Amino acid sequence: MADFFASSFWTGFLWPLIIMIAQSVLLLVVLLIAIAYILLADRKIWAAVQIRRGPNVVGPFGLFQSFADLLKFVLKEPIIPAGANKGVFLLAPLVSCVLALAAWAVIPTNLGWAIADINVGILFIFAISSLSIYGIIMAGWSSNSKYPFLAALRSAAQMVSYEVSIGFVIITVLLCAGTLNLSAVVEAQHARGLASLIGLPQLTILNWYVWPLFPMFVVFYVSALAETNRPPFDLVEAESELVAGFMVEYGSTPYLLFMLGEYVAITTMCALATILFLGGWLPPIDVAPFNWVPGVIWFALKLFFMFFLIAMAKAIVPRYRYDQLMRLGWKVFLPLSLVMVVVVAGVLHFAGIAPK
């Protein structure tokens, strides 16, 4: 027995695998609980803008409303349309949800707090977000209904249009940080920047990329809204036009999985914005008592700030027409992001401040 625990199979493969599985389960539990309260916050913010109370019955201040909704969905009977392709119909919400959760494998919430701290973490998330379109297309096609099919076509065009802009945003951050490793991007915002140039390295907030790359931050924010089908770009599930879009034939647990995948994707975009532009887990001022606060708390606060911006867009901005959505993506954001890539590369080169 002692020989087994000393073997290379145990130390080099089995034990690291057990640790990774335990980390994955812990992350999944924490993430799902966080999603429950992010969904509640979304409803509360929307209610506050409309001057009403919002969910306030289940638990104190409605804190357990999301768990009651979970129970309601799980206990309902799933209904599959007679003409639907049953296998693809049931697989679509699983694909959507699993892909959204997979992106969190590479997101660090603190220094060293990532299941897989890979050197191409940004590209991994970008690839996962690109694949998420398949869940929507599968749902739209397999439902054998015109409304889901139209929503799937809209979604394909919408996601392709705004992934291009997000790709150029990633390139500008790559130019500034010199790496695609998410932890290294955060550390780059601590080590160098405006605060170092003016001789105040404690003001780490001045090193965050949101200041020199503010136009790209705006492009990323709006593109994230479009990428995750959030208002004012919720053309895929427009209630007044397509009833509920690609989810119109879904109910019970499959519908819940789609909703879960949507909110996990929104949270992923908020986390990515936090890492790329807001310094990740870094405190705004690197002095006591700010640096006494654990980095994961700063990360959570910044993530919720980004989600608040997304929730406010849902509450106050009217829905775009589809032609306006396409025009914004191809005629405004694409040229702007291309110009910004050239400008950032030029400034870094001629100022001699490009990362080595």
Curated annotation (Swiss-Prot):
Subcellular location: Cell inner membrane
Predominant localisation class: membrane
UniProt keyword annotation of rRNA processing present: no
Enzyme Commission number: 7.1.1.-
GO biological process, one term: aerobic respiration
Keyword Nucleotide-binding: no
Keywords: Cell inner membrane, Cell membrane, Membrane, NAD, Quinone, Translocase, Transmembrane, Transmembrane helix, Ubiquinone
Single Gene Ontology MF annotation: quinone binding
UniProt record similarity statement: Belongs to the complex I subunit 1 family.
Assembly with partners or alone: NDH-1 is composed of 14 different subunits. Subunits NuoA, H, J, K, L, M, N constitute the membrane sector of the complex.
Role, per record: NDH-1 shuttles electrons from NADH, via FMN and iron-sulfur (Fe-S) centers, to quinones in the respiratory chain. The immediate electron acceptor for the enzyme in this species is believed to be ubiquinone. Couples the redox reaction to proton translocation (for every two electrons transferred, four hydrogen ions are translocated across the cytoplasmic membrane), and thus conserves the redox energy in a proton gradient. This subunit may bind ubiquinone.
NCBIfam families documented for this protein: PRK06076.1-6
PANTHER family noted in UniProt: NADH DEHYDROGENASE SUBUNIT 1, NADH-UBIQUINONE OXIDOREDUCTASE CHAIN 1
The protein, known as: NADH-quinone oxidoreductase subunit H
Organism: Bradyrhizobium sp. (strain ORS 278)
Organism phylogeny: Bacteria, Pseudomonadati, Pseudomonadota, Alphaproteobacteria, Hyphomicrobiales
Gene name for this UniProt entry: nuoH
